[in-house]
Amino acid sequence: MTSSYKDSSLKVFSLNSNPELANEIATHIGTNLGKCTVSKFSDGEVQINLEESVRGCDVYVVQSTCAPVNQHIMELLIMIDALKRASAKSINIVMPYYGYARQDRKARSREPIAAKLVADLIEKAGANRVITLDLHAPQIQGFFDIPIDHLQGVPILSSYFEQKNLDDVIVVSPDHGGVTRARKMADRLKAPIGIIDKRRPKPNVAEIMNIIGNIEGKTAILIDDIIDTAGTITLAANALIENGAKEVYACCTHPVLSGPAIERIDNSKIKELVITDSIPLPDEKFSTKITALSVAPLIGEAIIRVHEMQSVSILFD
């Protein structure tokens, strides 16, 4: 960016979930990260100290609520309270990954809707806006009574695959719920789509049932919003190869990659897994199959547009 916001009323702060991404976002905007200290009392309570004035400022707080999820949520809520009491003009939450998004409805009797609870907590604490990326369930936007800017990772992922110039591509959704996402990528790549029909007998366990679409001899690109234990995506990749696909790539916006995920990916038929840095990838989760793309330019541009009262939808329409 040629513009500089270093001396403006726009301030960007980072908490502990993804400081590298926050720093890249600030660099894209043309400013420095705001100064604050996040520490703990001996019993684990979170303590936050703002080390510069935010009075009258439009503040953007970067915090993905990834693991440890509850710790990062409490940091965020306490930061919002600190900013509110310090007379910030507006408190804007930049949450690339929205934790608890998979608990967006009552799948069974007597279950909570935790995604709604998190929304209530953020709003009640004093946030004025949320900027997020590829919510697991887009209807979570309706859990808030404040503005939500819902960015999409498909343009970033699609651009990467366009530059690879792959032959005879088919974009595949690993389940019926991801068809809309797969179609958006397929439209950008001018490719057909396929769907994997699966049954999930219990959480984090998936069974491949049927492949819808002609994949014989094609280069398949699996796309999902979240890869957690990688059971679904690796079973899907193996099934695609067994049914005639030439090679399989996979991509996702949010690389949770918990438990046996890396081992499964390394041992699978996936040639390359393309992710974004909405969730930081620690060294112990490194794999030669993984390529990480930055969402900092997208989020940075969204922040600028919000601050300048410009349209954000142009970033993904």
Curated annotation (Swiss-Prot):
Its cofactor is Mg(2+). Keywords: ATP-binding, Cytoplasm, Kinase, Magnesium, Metal-binding, Nucleotide biosynthesis, Nucleotide-binding, Transferase. Its main location: cytoplasm. Pathway: Metabolic intermediate biosynthesis; 5-phospho-alpha-D-ribose 1-diphosphate biosynthesis; 5-phospho-alpha-D-ribose 1-diphosphate from D-ribose 5-phosphate (route I): step 1/1. One of its GO terms (molecular function) is ATP binding. It is found in: Cytoplasm. Its EC number is 2.7.6.1. Mg(2+) 1 binds at residue 136. It comes from the Bacteria. The active site is at 198. Binds 2 Mg(2+) ions per subunit. Homohexamer. PANTHER family: RIBOSE-PHOSPHATE DIPHOSPHOKINASE FAMILY MEMBER, RIBOSE-PHOSPHATE PYROPHOSPHOKINASE 1, CHLOROPLASTIC. This is Ribose-phosphate pyrophosphokinase. It comes from Oceanobacillus iheyensis (strain DSM 14371 / CIP 107618 / JCM 11309 / KCTC 3954 / HTE831).
